[in-house]
Each structure stands twice: as C-alpha cells, then as structure tokens.
Amino acid sequence: MNAKRIRGLLIFAAVIAIAVLIWRHFTQTSPAAPGTSEQHAARTSHSGNNSSGNGGGRRAAMRTLAPVQAAVTQSASVPYYLSGLGTVTSANTVTLRSRVNGQLMALHFQEGQQVKAGDLLAEIDPRPFQVELTQAQGQLAKDRAVLANAQQDLARYQQLVKTNLISRQELDAQTAAVRQAEGTLKADEGAVASAQLQLDYSKITAPISGRIGLKQVDVGNYITSGDTNGIVVITQTYPIDVVFTVPEAEISTILNAQKSGQPPMVEAWDRANQKKLSQGTLLSMDNQIDATTGTIKLKARFDNLDDALFPNQFVNIRMKVDTLKNAVVAPSAAVQMGNEGRFVWILNDKNEVSKRQVTTSIQYGQLVVVTAGLDADVKVVTDGIDRLTEGAKVEVVPSALTEKTPAIAGEKS
C-alpha cells in the first residue's frame, strides 16, 4: 500500500514539473512578439514599396514606344510570270525496227549512248539478200541482151519493108517485140533495185539523233519487220520539249505575248521548285481547252545541251509573258490581310502609323506589286505589326528590309 502511494506521489510531482517547464517556456518567448510584429511590418512595408516600384515600372514601360521595322516602297520594272506544272517529253521518239526479216548478226551501240542520224546500229544477215540481188542482176543482163537483139532485128525490118521484102505486118510484130523487151527490162531493173534495197535494209541505221535506250533483243535472234518491241528505242534530247498547262483565263495574255515578235521565255525548275534546270522558249499552244480541268496545254522547247532535262521528268514551269513597268513594289511582309481585304501600316514623318487598304497583283520572294492604295517612296511597317493601333507613335529600329531590294521577277498571286 505504501509503495502505491509513493508511486502516485512521484507521478504527480512529474506532472507538476512538466507544467512548470511549459509555463516558463511561454513566458520567456512572449516578449519577442512585438519585435516580430515590427519585422513583419517592415517586411510588409518593404513589399509595399516594391509593389509601388513595380507599378511605376509598368507605367514607364507603357510609356515606351513600340519598336517596329520598316521599309520604303519603290518603283520598278517587274517581269510577270505564269506558273504551271509540266512533263519533259522527247522532241522525237523512234522505236528502231528492222525492215526485213532475218537473223540479227550484230549490234553497234551501247545502251544509253548518244547517236547521230545515219549511224550504223545493227546488222541483219545479208547473205539471202545478196543472193536475191545477184539473181535479179542476172535476169536484167539476160533481158538486156534480148532487147538489144530485138532492136537490131527491128532496124533490119525497117530497111526490108522499104523494098517490099517483108510485109508491113512483120515490121509491126517486130516493133511490138522490141517494146515488150523494153518493158521486161524495166521490170528487171525494178527487181534489181528492190533486191539492192533489201540488202541495204540489212544494215539498220539511226533515223534520228538521240539517246539509245535499253536493247529489246539480243544478237542471234531471228527478227521480223512486225516485231512490236523493235530493237531499241531512240529519244531525241537535243533539243527537248516540256508540255505544261496554264489556266484558260491566261490564254489572251499568252497570245498578246506571242504577238510581240519574240517567243515568250520559259524556265524549267526542279520538282521542289528550288533549282532552275534550264531556260527555253514557248514553241506552241494547243488548239482546244481541256473542259475537265479548265486548262490549256502548251509546249516549250529547250536546247538541253547539259542534259538537265530527261524524258518524263516532272518540272515546275515559269513563263514570262509581260513586264510591269513603273510598278509600285513593297515587301510582302508589310501586306496584311484583314476583314476588309489587304492593308499596310504606313509611317509619317512623326513616326505615327496609320492603316491603308491596298490592292496587290504579282509576288516574288520578299516583294509584292501594289496596284492601288500605295505610291512609291512611302515608308511601311514590315515587323512589329501586331502591336500597332491607329495613330500610335512607334520607334523604328534597323532592318535589312529598309534597304531597297530590286524587283527581278513576279508571279500572279
């Protein structure tokens, strides 16, 4: 019993001690609260000052002029180009075939080789044709002798009839015999010429100048004049043509360009429209419009001496049809599109901006031709446009576009 009482007293004493320690702790820290409040006030005051400073900075920033870049419009001569998609086509394409039947004895070309008209390309076994020629020549010689004999007899008959040693009927018969022999001789001469022609055909030559394709038959095969694939295909690449299309609305423009006396200049560009491949001239225009596409076909011719164009190659075409003289040219970056159409921001002498509606026609690279609403030597904004308002004053910063750039070409936009 005494042990339990002692344990209870110890627990009570421990609780009292803990309570005293807690009380002393709070009584020692509570005087620091005013200092803390002062520090908090100081921080609050400092924060307020910063807020005030930031507000002033924003107001100062609002008073800063919006930076823009500008360029000056100019008057220039701008070539007017029509664009189209085209396919390179050979000026002439020939499937080389034999004109006679026989065994192919030799091929005198390499695949992909450039050949000239008249070059020997293949040979057919000539022996059968040489035999036919010899026979025809022999028959010709025989009938020539027959004719000579008939002519001599006719000369004698003409003398004898004068002395009445032969009848007139015999003279007429001999005259007919001579004429018959002459006819036979002409037939023989034709047979000789035909045999000679067949022999000549055994040597196959290039009918045009061009590039040899892949051979369609090997040496040793028996070929005929009716073979569909022939021996090889020759395509003429010097010069070469491009067939392309333009909208039917441009027909009058093209016809006017042709009336100038010089065929319009045509440029061929690669598939990506990044590299100029060759330059030629317009050759011809089709005589009807494609009702399905509303376009018309045109053909241009290129020298192609550097083999830049290849048959069936896809190219982009630009054809010069006119030159716009004294056209007002502005950077295309200055022209914007709004609800009311195209417009630009112009700068006055006080660097104040104002919006002006414009009409444009053709464009090339960084330049666009302005046909209405803008004159030459006017300063227009090219960058920083999204920050502009009517009548706002701006700060013009240097730009590469502030220097005049010569207009060199144009396309319809």
From Swiss-Prot:
Its main location: membrane. Residues 32-59 are annotated as: Disordered. One of its GO terms (cellular component) is efflux pump complex. Residues 1-32 form the signal peptide. Keywords: Cell inner membrane, Cell membrane, Membrane, Signal, Transport. Residues 32-46 have a biased composition (Polar residues). It is found in: Cell inner membrane. It is a peripheral membrane protein. One of its GO terms (molecular function) is efflux transmembrane transporter activity. Pfam families: HlyD_D23. Belongs to the membrane fusion protein (MFP) (TC 8.A.1) family. Part of a tripartite efflux system composed of MdtA, MdtB and MdtC. PANTHER family: MULTIDRUG RESISTANCE PROTEIN MDTA. This is Multidrug resistance protein MdtA.
